[in-house]
């Protein structure tokens, strides 16, 4: 059964069990919640055209796999105190959550920011498997993917096998993403 389980705003609020999980992290409005809905084939996550709507960690069960939708980073129109709070619990979750076995960084294919590059650098320091997922491939020409892929590969020495291409909106390649999630968790 595909379902929303719970929200959390700190590590102590997270589900307290030993089930393995993966998380989706990315800038605000990059499509993380849309990906959740696409993987579930149902609207179990709230989506919005307004960036910064997800301000909690949201736990879902999809195809018997636990997936956590993390708040987006980089949105400028929330209070500084709220930004700091989100940043703190994201850091706490990524560094200390024992259930976390995989991180999927969701990037907008057309726009790679310095903050995205910093997050990739952070992922390389964690003892958790990670993948870079370029979303919105339906919106951009192939040249955008080639340019941004090269930017990531060159700047960070990331292996190409860590990169996935999807369109959450059109559900393109979501099956490949789900297979990778299952592989990471098992």
Swiss-Prot record:
It comes from the Bacteria. CDD domains: YihA_EngB. The keyword Metal-binding applies. Keywords: Cell cycle, Cell division, GTP-binding, Magnesium, Metal-binding, Nucleotide-binding, Septation. Residues 18-186 form the EngB-type G domain. GO terms for cellular component: cytosol. Its cofactor is Mg(2+). Pfam families: MMR_HSR1. InterPro entries: G_ENGB_dom (IPR030393), GTP-bd (IPR006073), GTP-bd_ribosome_bio_YsxC (IPR019987), P-loop_NTPase (IPR027417), Small_GTP-bd (IPR005225). One of its GO terms (biological process) is division septum assembly. One of its GO terms (molecular function) is GTP binding. GTP binds at residues 26-33, 52-56, 69-72, 135-138, 166-168. Mg(2+) binds at residues 33, 54. Belongs to the TRAFAC class TrmE-Era-EngA-EngB-Septin-like GTPase superfamily. EngB GTPase family. Necessary for normal cell division and for the maintenance of normal septation. This is Probable GTP-binding protein EngB. It comes from Mycoplasmoides gallisepticum (strain R(low / passage 15 / clone 2)).
């Amino acid at each position: 059964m595909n379902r929303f389980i719970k929200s959390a705003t700190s590590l102590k609020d997270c589900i307290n069990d030993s089930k393995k999980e993966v998380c989706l992290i990315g800038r605000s409005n990059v499509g993380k919640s849309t990906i959740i809905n696409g993987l579930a084939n149902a609207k179990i996550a709230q989506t919005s055209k307004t960036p910064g709507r997800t301000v909690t960690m949201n736990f879902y069960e999809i195809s018997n796999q636990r997936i956590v939708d993390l708040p987006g980073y980089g949105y400028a129109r929330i209070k500084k105190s709220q930004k700091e709070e989100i940043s703190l619990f994201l850091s706490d979750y990524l560094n200390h959550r024992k259930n976390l076995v995989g991180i999927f960084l969701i990037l907008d294919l057309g726009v790679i920011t310095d903050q995205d590059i910093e997050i990739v650098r952070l992922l390389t320091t964690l003892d958790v498997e990670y993948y870079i997922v370029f979303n919105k491939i339906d919106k951009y020409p192939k040249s955008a993917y080639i340019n941004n892929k090269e930017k990531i590969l060159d700047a960070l020495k990331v292996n190409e096998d860590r990169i996935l291409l999807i369109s959450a909106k059109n559900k393109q390649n979501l099956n490949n993403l789900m297979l990778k999630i299952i592989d990471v968790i098992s």
